[in-house]
Every structure is written in structure tokens, then in C-alpha cells.
Amino acid sequence: MIGRDFSKGEDRWVVDQDFIPRRSSTASVVIEGVQQGEDASLYIMWTKIGYPPCSKVVPVMVDDVPRELQPDPLTWHSPLCDFVVEQKHKVFSIKRGSGKNYIDMDLLKEIMKQQSTISQENYKKGYIKREEKAKSLKK
């Protein structure tokens, strides 16, 4: 809206306004379907659970939900989501006044860089898993 890329700027504190992910966002999901004739079990849900900018991409297939996304038997929380929410609280660390609306961009950039590296690996792993499953279905 204002034509600025805050990820490249030098401002440390930025108001969380007019961004696609909001402080209240709980996940970002993309469903990758299959082509006509392919088995529906080859669908992949690419998930960033918790506050998306602090999360990593995790591939989820119909019959394989990664342990880090499954609920803990005591808390019924996803361990990954709890970790990501902790990171979000660090990024939105100001508690007084309107501080809850300010993002620490220095910390967010650091977290996003780490999570991006992990996400790239997870994309590769997800596609390999999908290819292996597709081959096993053809047997």
C-alpha cells in the first residue's frame, strides 16, 4: 500500500499494519493438489503453523502428519506451534501502551532467515516423499 519493503529497510520497530500476516494469524496453508488420474493421497498441504513469519514450512500428506504438528497428549498443543508462538512473543515484545502492535524487525529478519533455510530443506523432503509414494502406488 505504501510501496515499502520493510524486510530490506533499516527501521528496527515497525507498526504491524497492512501486512498479510497479522499478529493474530495462526497459520498459513497451501494445498497442492494432484493432476487428473493421480491418486488423491498424493496431495500435500504445505503448512506454516503459528505466526507464519516466525514459522517454517512443513509438508503434510493425507496419511502422514509430522509429529511436530501433532498434539502433545498433555497439553493438546502442537509442539511446533508452541515454539512459533514463543518466537512471535519475542518479535512483539513491547507490552505497554500500543506496543503490542510493533514488530521488532531485526529479530524477525533473523528468525525468518533461519526458518527459510529449514523451509527449503522441507520442500525438498516433501517432494521426495511424494515421489516415493507415487512410485509405491504404481507397483
Regions found by a protein language model. Name each.
Residues 1-139:
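C-terminus-biased signal that marks the final domain/tail of proteins
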